[in-house]
Amino acid sequence: MRFSTALSLALAVSPAAVFAAGNLGFSLGVKRPDGQCKDQADFEKDFDTLKAHGTTVRTYAAADCGSASLILPAAKSKGFKVVLGIWPDVEESYKADVDALKKAVPGNEDVVAAITVGSETLYRGNFTGPELLKKIKEVQKVFPKITIGTADSWNKYADGTADALIEGGVKYLLVNAFAFWQGKAIEQAPKTLFDDLVGAAKRIADKAPQGSSPYVAIGETGWPTDGGTDYGAAKAGTKNAEKFYKEGVCAMLAWGVDAFYFEAFDEPWKPKSIGDNGNAADETHWGMYTADRKPKFNADCKVNKKKD
């Protein structure tokens, strides 16, 4: 595909960024459709559904719903790996998440793919790059054998906001890229996804310490299905979501880029949020699956997955 060729050429001049095997992962909520907390059995059912596509999920705040202590044994029983999250924006949540991980991780290190400190923290302006780097280093000291990193919007890598993290040697960098929230029509959305990743990856490669190879993957991308809210030229709908998935996400996987799809299942408990345009936006219809784990579209990329 031309997008893949363009991405390959863009990164060929900046070889420090290393992409993995093109595996699909999912952002996974920790609450049931009614807003109650999931238990271990719920996570196991989630994994049974998702294993047809991939065996990695990411969450955002380890203490939320006591999720870390529940999802790790579920992952171990089903052959999954988990990217656990720490929410550092508020000191209370930061400490609670670290404490939750201190209890949950020992004995389950084999199913912890990484720990992310923050999700779009730089994008929201809650930390500077140096401030977030300090938090990441604090967590790395607590979990010396676990890969520690962060996730942020593609433009915060591309515009230099995240330079301190890259230059500081952070080894795990997730790049969130939503053509939908950039207001792109579906016809332009797959190319926008590639352009976003190229912009972030080139900056990461240029700023990474000599000899280092930070792991770079798409941390979040997706498209709302039927029932979702439009955003400018970006129109919600299941057909558009499938098109974006097949022409954008699947193409990335075919090229060899790992990607986390946002999200695994609808979350009907979520309240509306206010977008950058000031309008209320629905966040309950972003799942590849409905809240009761029914598929919305055929998610078979027809690409060969690398064996672990």
UniProtKB/Swiss-Prot annotation:
Belongs to the glycosyl hydrolase 17 family. Cell wall glucan 1,3-beta-glucosidase involved in cell wall biosynthesis and virulence. Crucial for delivery of beta-1,3-glucan to the biofilm matrix and for accumulation of mature matrix biomass. It is found in: Secreted; Secreted, Cell wall; Cytoplasm. The active site is at E120, E220. Its EC number is 3.2.1.58. Induction: Expression is down-regulated in presence of human keratinocytes. It comes from Arthroderma benhamiae (strain ATCC MYA-4681 / CBS 112371) (Trichophyton mentagrophytes). InterPro entries: Beta-glucan_modifiers, Glyco_hydro_17, Glycoside_hydrolase_SF. This is Glucan 1,3-beta-glucosidase ARB_02797. One of its GO terms (cellular component) is cytoplasm.
